[in-house]
Each structure stands twice: as structure tokens, then as C-alpha cells.
Amino acid sequence: MIFVYNLKMRNLILLFIALFFATSTYSQKIGYEFRTNGKAYISTSYAGFEVRHRTDKEENRFTYRYKMLDSEKFTFSLPLHYKVEKEKATLEPRLKYHLNKFSLWAQKEFNLEENMNAAFGIDIPVNDFTYRIGWDSSDTVRFRLVKKF
């Protein structure tokens, strides 16, 4: 019981730290994602750079996302991730197709030594929020909420 309480408090404290970090660094977005495999992430981003922290482990990732194509109907971006604790860099090309009220996307993560997960999903923007529902090839469903500033 105490362990569960401490875990909830730790996640709440991490959320407040991320909010403080986001507001103090003038971030453009802050997000929270949880997955059916038990993983959860807090992220903040500014001008193509993103910092993501996995809340159930000490795991951090830095990302630079370069948009190669950004049109009214399509966005093709090429994020370069660096996973700090694993000392591993990966690429994760993403293609988004924009419709009137939502966007469909597909992405594939890999590096030179390893073929990693593919993921598919839907982004639904509502005012300053974006809701994401997705699935990846490890049979995990993901849900994400992002607030734009």
C-alpha cells in the first residue's frame, strides 16, 4: 500500500517538475503518454527539440525532429532520438496524413544494429490539446495528451 502511494506521489511530483520545466523554458508543448504495457512518459518540446522521461524507470530520451515535408495534406518528419541510459541513437521517420478533424500517422524506429517497433495512430486536435490513440508492433496501445502553449 505504501509502495503504491509512493509511486503515485513520485509520478505526481515528476508531472509538476515537467510543468515547471515547460513553463520556465517557454516550451511549445508538454505531453503525457501511457501505454497498455505499463510504460508512461512525460515530455516537453520546443522548436523541434524534445525531452522525454519514462516515469516507471530512470529512462530519458532527447529528440530533434526535422520536418522534411510539411504541406496541407502531408507531413514527413525525421526524428533523431538519443536514449541516454542505453547510449543509443535511433531514427524514427513519421508520415502524417492530415484530414479535416484528425491526422493519421505511421512511423518506424530503427538504428544500424536493430530493427525496432512500427507504430500507427490517430491524432485528434481540439483547441490547444491533441489527443493521440495509437498501436505499435509490440501489441501495445498508446494514449497521449499534449497541451500546446
Feature annotation, model-predicted:
Residues 42-44, 51-53, 64, 95, ...:
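Membrane-embedded beta-strands that build the outer-membrane beta-barrel scaffold
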